[in-house]
A protein has these predicted regions:
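Short beta-strand segments at enzyme active-site cores
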Residues: 57, 81-85, 116-123
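Conserved active-site and cofactor/substrate-binding residues in soluble primary-metabolism enzymes
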Residues: 19, 34, 38, 42, ...
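Glycine-rich phosphate-binding loop
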Residues: 69-106
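Glycine-rich phosphate/diphosphate-binding loop of Rossmann-like nucleotide-binding domains
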Residues: 14-59
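Short N-terminal or domain-adjacent regulatory/targeting segments
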Residues: 1-21
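C-terminal binding/interaction regions
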Residues: 96-97, 101-156
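Short beta->alpha junction loops
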Residues: 55-64, 124
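Short, well-ordered secondary-structure micro-motifs
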Residues: 37-39, 67-71, 93-97, 130-134
Length: 156
């Protein structure tokens, strides 16, 4: 019997400790809901795996609408970090690029203003619907990024 834990179990254990006591707020886009629903579930599942609590979930019509909801969550004392979950699919124009760039920029500004992490779990731009379905794990990565940054900023 091997008494030393393998690298996989060490990583899982250290990540679970990392998320302990973290309270997250989710902002979820309803546009492309078939995809963002999967992303939301995966994000919640990963937060629970890491020992974090999803304290609040706000639904917004689209990615462009995320900043105001993120601001409301960031104002709360019971939210340590915000995870933005959305999916922007390429159309006939550059609309997808404009939406993602402006939303990402404003979410970054809010993170700096409130001194709390805001992680992007937004797939796109320049993504087809099949591409977006393959990238639902962006939500999982965003949850992990929010928790890691929150923990690394503690005590500074």
């Amino acid at each position: 019997m091997d008494l030393l834990p393998n690298a996989r179990s060490l990583k899982a254990t250290s990540l679970a400790v990392l998320g302990a006591m973290a309270k997250l707020g989710f902002v979820v886009s309803e546009f492309n809901r078939d995809i963002t629903y999967q992303m939301e579930l995966l994000g919640k599942e990963h937060a629970a795996f890491l020992g974090a609590e999803v304290a609040h979930v706000l639904y917004v019509p689209g990615v462009y609408d995320m900043p105001i909801a993120a601001r409301r969550l960031l104002r709360r004392d019971d939210v340590d970090a915000v995870v933005a979950i959305g999916c922007v699919i390429q159309g006939e124009t550059a609309h997808d690029e404009v939406v993602v760039q402006h939303a990402a920029r404003k979410l970054m500004d809010l993170s700096l203003e409130y001194d709390k992490p805001v992680a992007l779990g937004i797939s796109g731009p320049r993504m087809s619907r099949p591409d977006a379905h393959r990238r639902v794990d962006y939500a999982k990565r965003a949850v992990e990024a929010a928790i890691k940054l929150m923990k690394r900023l503690e005590g500074i």
